[in-house]
Design a protein with these regions (language model features):
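Alpha/beta enzyme core
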Residues: 2-243, 250-257
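Extended, intrinsically disordered, low-complexity segments
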Residues: 1-12, 19, 246-290
Length: 290
């Protein structure tokens, strides 16, 4: 594997170490989902300690559906831009890793070269509207996680891996089966090198608590309107919480509200609720001074 310049690798490793420290800290890590550079800048300004990329939000903002619809090259380019804009760790949403084990290695190397702290790697397959249709075989996903470890070793990288499990989405009709599979995979992924185990479609306090107790790694969930509060999640033992494309949804919802007001009333009073030009300019000016 082609080496990465030492100064680039050192900078990436510094952010990877920081992200790992934050996930292992006593206080739960809250990671908002950036869908463009401006949202990443805003999150850093507001005091978030790390930022998550949202594949669904980024794809939608570019006019694509979720699910590796954008190329690896574009994904890496955008992830690098997000990372360069902020000083806090940025974790990319690597979806399924862009290919088999060799593809995963290429993705990891490209992200490290872009200075990115880490990535999500998911085990859902057979996309359908709203999520995965099935889980990839455990052995196949373990090969991908091992590929991440091998790439890190070859590069001298401390890249962070957030291993995502889609069991609760795929097995929504059988929560007991989903929980058993979620625990089994969580421990297997952690043993193979996952730094954090990330679950979707789980909101039950009882289930979240069991995951935190029975999976031998830091645990994270994707939060939604049904989820417990951040304080409750910390009390349940979670290490991390993220929000996927929630902020893109909020932004496009605000755009629709203003557009509807113009069409129906010919006014723009709801614009008062938005961020004003001086605030936006202050964000991007700070970025361009760094």
């Amino acid at each position: 594997m082609e080496p990465i310049p030492r100064e680039v690798l050192d900078a990436a490793n510094s952010k990877s170490r920081r992200l790992r420290e934050l996930v292992r800290a006593p206080e739960i890590l809250v990671m908002p989902g950036a869908y463009d550079v401006l949202s990443a800048l805003l999150f850093e300004q507001m005091g978030f300690k790390a930022i998550q990329g949202t594949s669904g939000g980024i794809a939608a903002a570019l006019g694509y559906p979720d699910g590796e619809a954008i190329s690896r090259e574009l994904f890496v380019e955008l992830s690098g831009k997000f990372n360069a804009a902020v000083s806090v760790p940025f974790n990319a949403d690597g979806e399924r890793g862009y290919g088999d084990e060799n593809g995963v290695k290429e993705t990891v190397r490209a992200l490290v070269a872009a200075g990115v702290a880490g990535m999500n790697l998911e085990d859902g397959a057979g996309r359908k509207r709203g999520g995965a249709r099935e889980l990839v075989e455990l052995s196949e996903q373990l090969r991908k996680i091992n590929a991440v470890t091998e790439a890190k070793r070859a590069l001298g990288s401390e890249f962070f891996l957030n291993a995502r499990i889609d069991a609760f989405m795929v097995m929504a009709d059988d929560q007991k089966k989903a929980l058993d599979e979620a625990i089994r995979r969580g421990n297997a992924y952690a043993e193979a090198g996952g730094d954090c185990i990330f679950y979707l479609s789980v909101h039950s306090r009882e289930i979240i608590g069991r995951l935190a107790r029975e999976v031998k790694a830091p645990i994270s969930i994707l939060a939604g309107p049904q989820s417990p509060s951040v304080n409750e999640l910390q009390d349940l033992g979670l290490a991390r919480v993220s929000y996927g494309s929630a902020f893109l949804k909020a932004a496009i919802g605000g755009t629709r509200k203003l557009a509807r007001e113009i069409l129906e009333n010919g006014t723009v009073t709801s614009l008062k609720e938005g961020m004003q030009t001086p605030e936006i300019n202050a964000l991007v000016t700070k970025k361009n001074r760094n």
